[in-house]
Swiss-Prot record:
Sequence positions that bind ATP: I24, G25, G26, G27, G28, F29, S30, K31, V32, K49
Stored InterPro entries: Chk1_catalytic_dom (IPR034670), Kinase-like_dom_sf (IPR011009), Prot_kinase_dom (IPR000719), Protein_kinase_ATP_BS (IPR017441), Ser/Thr_kinase_AS (IPR008271)
Organism: Mycosarcoma maydis
Highest taxon above the source species: Eukaryota
Protein name: Serine/threonine-protein kinase CHK1
Entry GO MF terms: ATP binding; protein serine kinase activity; protein serine/threonine kinase activity
Entry GO terms, CC: cytoplasm; nucleus; site of double-strand break
Length: 662
């Protein structure tokens, strides 16, 4: 595999014996890559976070070198099962004195290593630098942090928006979140950016707290200092972060309370904790508890949430108080005595069942499960039953309108030209909404049952054809996620294209019976209708699927028009010239979510069909044959909001009718 290069022709170097192989996220100053080190006994696959020191037109503010230095110093000393492990850090393309036109580094030329393996690699690289001082002159200048890979992906990628997860799952992950936070604070550190985007899963489904870029040391040798400066994401920050001094523990307690709320109901309670938010104002008066989704929250959990999100920090519950709360102390069959997942396959099954019942994933249903679904759908006279959608009765009709449309959004949220019963409190923005309007509840239940029925197959299938447990990062949890949702027709396209996308922790994906060209055109049309900035590029045989220059490594501006990447690119018709390569295409997109936060990522349309069948036939397409795979990969933003955008794409009738499985 070719080592990727930046738009300046500079390359990304080996880092502490790790070789960069795949871009997996990021934006602005930083990008995150997957990296491999086959000789490592503990982490053969890792993540490398690269913070560029190179000037870029899209970077409006200079890099905060002191903050970077603090992030490395703090994260490198944190060792806990629920904290993403820091393996090491090096700088490349820099000079500790700023000589030779290079940027001045923050590590003063010295690599940071925290494990025996990374220490050995650091010493080896040090010898190489002594023997060849100019060996890194053509590397992308920046800080390279080697981190544990969150092989299970984002936790909230597996939680249905406006639905949430069952109480035991929320309790399991909240216990792990609190364990990690208690440890962090025991070291005198406050995270200050607890949100879904910074909650990853390891290969066994356990939670890992990530990203210490906004952390601060607030306690040292028993002495505590107050902090200043608002930071984090508005829906999750504490109300006292308003420019005045605040304490370190209460702000993380508040943010973890909002995260718990989001796990239970699939939405944040407000846009921001200020008087500008009608929801937060209603929360302070107590009126908000009358409206969905608050009544859906179990009473003990609600009791804890109220204590964690008390507007007055002095009256807010502490971490110690949370641990004594009756909801926190409830038994949980998913967890070992040491606080880890005791059955990764069961955990994957429960997460997927929630997505199936909410309608956020589509699973190919056949055999007994399909027959059961048909029986549920029919009355005794053989006529189809009218199965109502599981929607709040207070939800306005506008829910079927695009949630990304600004005009419709105000009405759908209930804050424009709509009020609650009797002209009272407007409808909360987090009221429930159906995922796929054309789907019915009986089929959703059948899909959930089908996921359970496939568990018996997993132990034998996982080691058989199509499931390589020896793949880097493969585990029972990650393989179960794919096995339970995989459709049988996939075996007909095995070996075509690049399979690493098919077997990944990303659940914002679907297999389609339409051609890649058709789906590409439809997705771009949906994004245009939603006013989502987007640009696409063809992917050809001569390119690595996720590493070619089209990423414009440090570009964080608006998506730009791209050119064909090879001779296989061709227009697909329509008003806009669409580019589709022999392997498919990639769409880069950027928008603002409904909480006014940046949402950025890419959509991959991978061609699975034979070379001579890349377009839709005039005859009826084979409904069971997958012609393309679509994967939406979030780069930056709230995972719940990313899944909402995925939902919007899938709702398009022309796309929905081609979806075989997700």
């Amino acid at each position: 595999m070719t080592i990727p290069k930046s738009s300046t022709g500079q390359s990304y170097p080996p880092v502490l014996d790790y070789r960069i192989v795949q871009l997996i996220g990021g934006g602005g100053f930083s990008k995150v890559f997957r990296a491999v080190n086959p000789s490592s006994e503990s982490h053969s696959v890792a993540a490398i976070k690269v913070i560029s020191y190179a000037p870029n037109r899209s970077n409006k503010y200079p890099i905060d070198r002191r903050a970077l230095q603090k992030e490395v110093q703090v994260h490198s000393i944190l060792k806990h099962p629920n904290v993403l492990e820091f393996l090491g850090a090096v700088e490349r393309g820099v000079d500790k004195n700023g000589n030779a036109g290079k940027e001045k580094g923050i590590l003063m030329g010295e690599a940071v290593a925290t494990t025996k393996e990374s220490i050995r690699a650091r010493d080896k690289e040090r010898q190489q630098m002594l023997s060849s001082p100019s060996h890194d002159q053509n590397y992308v200048p920046g800080l390279y942090m080697v981190l544990e890979l969150g092989a299970g992906g984002d936790l909230f990628d597996k939680i249905a928006p406006d639905y949430g997860v069952e109480e035991d799952l929320a309790h399991f992950y909240f216990q792990q979140l609190l364990a990690g936070l208690e440890y962090i604070h025991s070291q005198g550190v406050t995270h200050r950016d607890i949100k879904p985007e910074n909650m990853l899963l390891d290969a066994e489904g356990n939670l890992k707290i990530a990203d210490f870029g906004l952390c601060s040391v607030y306690k040292y040798k028993g002495k505590e200092r107050e902090l200043t400066g608002a930071c984090g994401s508005l829906p999750y920050i504490a109300p006292e972060m308003n420019g005045k001094p605040y304490r370190g523990e209460p702000v993380d307690v508040w943010s973890s309370g909002v995260v718990l709320f989001a796990m239970l109901v699939g939405s944040t309670p407000w846009d921001e904790p200020t008087s500008r938010s009608p929801e937060y104002s209603a929360y302070r008066t107590g009126k908000l508890f009358e409206y969905d989704p608050w009544p859906r929250i179990p009473q003990d959990a609600l009791s804890l949430l109220k204590k964690m999100m008390h507007p007055t920090p002095e009256k807010r519950i502490t971490f110690e108080g949370i641990r004594r709360h009756r909801w926190f102390k409830r038994a949980n069959d998913l967890m070992t005595q040491k606080g880890k997942c005791n059955d990764p396959v069961n955990l994957a099954e429960k997460l997927l069942q929630g997505l199936a019942v909410s309608g956020d994933i589509i699973v190919e249903v056949n055999g007994a499960a399909a027959a059961a679904a048909r029986r549920l759908d029919l009355h005794s006279d053989g006529q189809r039953a009218q199965v109502p959608e599981n929607v709040s009765l207070t939800q306005p009709d506008a829910i079927l309108t695009s949630s990304f449309d600004l005009a419709a959004r105000a009405v759908a949220r209930g804050w424009a030209d709509d009020t609650g019963p009797g002209g009272g409190l407007p409808l909360p923005s987090s009221t429930a909404m159906p995922a796929f309007a054309s789907d019915d509840m009986s089929r959703r239940l059948a899909m959930s049952q089908h996921i359970s029925s496939r568990r018996a197959e997993f132990s034998t299938t996982a080691s058989g054809s199509g499931y390589d447990m020896a793949l880097p990062g493969a585990s029972q949890f990650t393989q179960a996620l794919n096995h339970f949702t995989q459709f049988e027709a996939l075996t007909h396209v095995a070996g075509t294209g690049s399979s690493h996308l098919r077997f990944s922790p990303h659940l914002t994906r679907f297999f389609s019976s339409a051609s890649a060209a058709t789906i590409l055109a439809l997705i771009i049309d949906v994004l245009d209708r939603l006013a989502v900035l987007n640009a696409h590029q063809a992917i050809g045989d001569q390119e690595e699927l996720e590493l070619e220059e089209a990423y414009n490594f440090m570009a964080d501006g608006e998506p730009e028009t791209t050119v064909p990447s090879d001779d296989s690119s061709r227009p697909t018709g329509g008003s806009k010239r669409l580019l589709i390569g022999s392997r498919g295409a990639r769409i880069r997109l950027k928008t603002m979510d409904r909480r006014k936060c940046v949402l950025r990522g890419e959509v991959y349309v991978e061609n699975l069909a034979a070379p001579d069948s890349t377009s839709d036939s005039a005859s009826a397409p084979d409904r069971n044959a997958a012609k393309c795979l679509v994967v939406m990969k979030k780069g930056k933003g709230d995972p719940l909001e990313w899944r909402r955008l995925f939902r919007e794409v899938c709702r398009r009738p022309e796309i929905m009718q081609t979806i075989i499985s997700t």
